[in-house]
């Protein structure tokens, strides 16, 4: 059975289709030159899935120990997995939180092969929140298809019903964005995917929805999250100032300002979560 997401640029990072697991991750983390006077938001799972392989080769042990030794970081585990047994049984430091990619089950079935179902992701997030671990949600990619409004409204309402704002560190919004090598690889793979059927414009050297479509889909999801406005940190992934201003009514001046705001919001909730 094929696993992985058809649309993900991660597949262009690797050439042989194999997963490699570090045997000395703890040593490599120890060697990272962190400034004790600075704060860091570190995302684990940027080029993989933080929880899919569990604690193979002690990779989760190493990351928890790294977070425990560095109180000036917040370490985010990004996942589409239901594999949370390790975290439920571990002594998880308060500066770690876990975030899930959220999409309607229809999209998961067609494009996110071999990943946990929507219900499994939500149940896993609920279990970690119940254990005092902060969670987050990435509505990325939000996809415009026939019936998308109904499906995403249901999804947002499900999240709102299952979690309180105090349990959620952040919510991100994003959509399909393709780099040229990924488009070529997807076309040559023979994968039964519909993501390349979307109308795309050039966007910062990549391919993505037209700006008018982005504004429409982001605004709809943002409005559905109205009960959490001002209570949860929201942001958009890789979007221009014009889109931020149109949807949120504001935009950070630079990445440093954005990272400072994210760190303050998330770390503030971490101090109350456990």
Name every feature range the model reports, one short phrase each.
Residues 1-5:
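Cysteine-centered iron-sulfur cluster-binding motifs in ferredoxin-type domains/subunits
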Residues 6-101:
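Conserved Radical SAM active-site core
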Residues 29-35, 86-91, 118-131, 221:
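Structured alpha-helical segments in the cores of large, soluble enzyme domains
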Residues 40-44, 75-77, 98-100, 135-139, ...:
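Hydrophobic faces of well-ordered beta-strands that scaffold small-molecule active sites
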Residues 48-51, 82-85, 96-115, 141-146, ...:
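Conserved radical SAM core fold
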Residues 129, 134-143, 152:
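Long, hydrophobic N-terminal alpha-helical segment
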Residues 147-162:
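Catalytic cores of alpha/beta
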Residues 160-274:
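Auxiliary Fe-S-binding modules of radical SAM enzymes
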């Amino acid at each position: 059975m094929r696993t992985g997401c058809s649309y993900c640029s991660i597949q262009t990072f690797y050439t042989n289709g194999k997963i490699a697991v570090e045997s000395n991750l703890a040593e490599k983390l120890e060697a990272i030159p962190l400034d004790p006077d600075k704060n860091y938001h570190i995302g684990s799972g940027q080029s993989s899935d933080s929880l899919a392989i569990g604690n193979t080769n002690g990779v989760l042990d190493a990351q928890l120990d790294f977070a425990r030794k560095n109180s000036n970081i917040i370490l985010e585990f990004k996942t589409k997995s239901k594999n949370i047994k390790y975290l439920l049984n571990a002594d998880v430091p308060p500066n770690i939180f876990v975030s899930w990619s959220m999409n309607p089950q229809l999209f998961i079935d067609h494009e996110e092969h071999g990943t946990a179902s929507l219900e499994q992701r939500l149940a896993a997030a609920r279990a970690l929140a119940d254990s005092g671990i902060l969670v987050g949600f990435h509505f990325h990619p939000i996809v415009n298809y026939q019936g998308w409004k109904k499906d995403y409204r249901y999804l947002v309402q499900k999240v709102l019903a299952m979690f309180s704002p105090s349990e959620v560190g952040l919510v991100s919004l994003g959509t399909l964005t393709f780099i040229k090598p990924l488009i070529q690889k997807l076309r040559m793979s023979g994968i039964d995917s519909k993501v390349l059927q979307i109308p795309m414009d050039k966007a910062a050297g990549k391919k993505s929805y037209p700006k008018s479509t982005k504004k429409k889909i982001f605004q709809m999801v943002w409005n559905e999250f109205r009960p959490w406005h001002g209570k949860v940190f929201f942001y958009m992934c890789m979007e221009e100032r014009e889109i931020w201003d149109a949807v949120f009514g504001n935009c950070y001046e630079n990445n440093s300002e954005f990272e400072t705001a994210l760190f303050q919001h998330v770390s503030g909730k971490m101090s109350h979560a456990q």
